[in-house]
Amino acid sequence: MHGLTTLAPEPTFVNTGVSTIRCPLFSQREAGAAMDVSFLGGPRPQRGVAVVAPFDFALDRELWRWVPDEVSLHLTRTPFVPVEVSLDLARLVSEHETLGEAVRALSAVAPEVVAYACTSGSFVGGIAGERAMCAAMSGAGDALPSVTTSGALLEALEELRIRRVALVTPYTVSVTRALERYVAEAGIRVTGCSFMGLTRRIWQVPYRDVVAMARRAARPGAADALFISCTNLPTYDVIPQLEAELRIPVLSANQVTMWAALRRMGTRAVGPYQALLDEAARAWPVLPEEAQGHQDHQEHGEGLT
């Protein structure tokens, strides 16, 4: 009407979490309606992996890197004990009563599989001890499928048809020897081994040290695969580099644990250029010197019977 002034909507200030934005055209109610996402029908249903880890486990974020978007990890830890990394600690964090309590707590979120994320804790009792751990966890979790890191290692070696393996560990000599015995019990020959002698703060080991140890352990032509032990040792980003350099599959504790757990759910772990997870990555390109050597061998052998 003549003589009347139409007023613009009162400015609305929206806090985005980064800065405050002045929105003069929308009221708060209108802004909320514009952001309505209920029609999407989310959130996306999640499938769960229950993870039991030692009290000093520090690499939760690394575990998640192998997990597809539709899967959640539900972690719990064993009770603290004032013992450094050793065979004694391995026995303490793998006691069946401790595992049972952890699995019963995790069962509240209805996981599809239980994973025990500790290498030494699952190889300290040998193959029979590892199987007993799985039985104890499944028994506490209403018959849920259960895996351990050491059991997953043997499963991965079988998947890749590996009979000779080199080992890298952050452990002391006594813990490392126990791993060697476990692998040998499964009929796998250990061709080389490097260990760091650490008893604490293993998660702080830099990638460069892991790579250096791998180069020392995996002698050219001696091993069919390399295994980097300990779920507290960072490995995700070095696996493709080491596989390209050593030209053999490189397995790590966290990798095989997630691979085996997700396999029981009928889904695949995520890991670009990792031979265990991607069959295409197992076809190593032929290097020029290898091609020449093969040609020389054929020429030398012509005419022989």
Question: Which positions does each model-derived feature cover?
Answer:
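Periplasmic-binding protein-like
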Residues: 112-117, 166-167, 222-230
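C-terminal functional extensions of proteins
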Residues: 252-290
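Glycine/small-residue-rich loop that forms an oxyanion/phosphate-binding "nest" at active or ligand-binding sites
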Residues: 106-107, 112-141
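Short terminal hydrophobic/aromatic SLiMs and anchors at protein ends
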Residues: 3-7, 19-21, 26-27
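Hydrophobic alpha-helical
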Residues: 213-245, 258
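Intrinsic-disorder-associated, low-complexity terminal segments enriched in Asp/Asn/His/Tyr and depleted
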Residues: 15, 294-297
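N-terminal glycine-rich anion-binding loop in soluble enzyme alpha/beta folds
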Residues: 26, 32-101, 168-206
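Conserved beta-alpha
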Residues: 136-140, 144-199, 278
